[in-house]
C-alpha cells in the first residue's frame, strides 16, 4: 500500500466526518469555523421534533453564506467534511486498485510468471479497509449515488447519522448499496480478473 500511496494523494482513502451543534431560535448564528478537520463539504440544518428526531421537511443547506438566521424551535447544524486517511488506500476507487495491482503485485507476478497457476496455485491479499465509522467516502461517490438513486446524497447526509422519520431507512440503504457496489466493482471485480488472467485462485 505504501508504494501506491507515495505516488499520489489521490490514492488515499477518504472518510466523511462531521461536527454537530444545537441551537434554539430565534437567533443569528455564525457558521464560520464549524467544519471538522478536512475538506469542507456541506452544512445542513434541521429542526428537532419533540422526540429529538429530525424533521425532514425542515432540512436546509446553509453552506453559504457564513451566517444563518435560526428560526423558532430547537435546530441542529450538521457540518460535514471529507478527511483523508493517509495510511490507507481508497478501495472504492478503480484507478487506485489498478495501481495497487500494478505495483507491487505485478512485480512479483512477472518475476514468478512461470510458476503461477502451478507451483503457485493461488494468491492471498491482505484485508482491504473500508471504514464504517467515520462514514466511507470517495470523490466519485456523490455522482454515482445520484445516478443510482436519482437524488443528491449531500442534501440527505444528516439521515446517515440521525433518525428522520420514514426516509431514514431508505437513505441509509441507498448509501450502503452504492458503497457496496463501488467496492465490488473497484476491488473484487478487478482482483478476480487479475487472478484469472494468471491462472491463480484467489485464496
Where are these regions (language model features)?
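Aromatic-lined carbohydrate-recognition surfaces of secreted/lumenal glycan-active proteins
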Residues: 1-2, 119-127, 175-203
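Mature extracytoplasmic enzyme cores
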Residues: 1-173
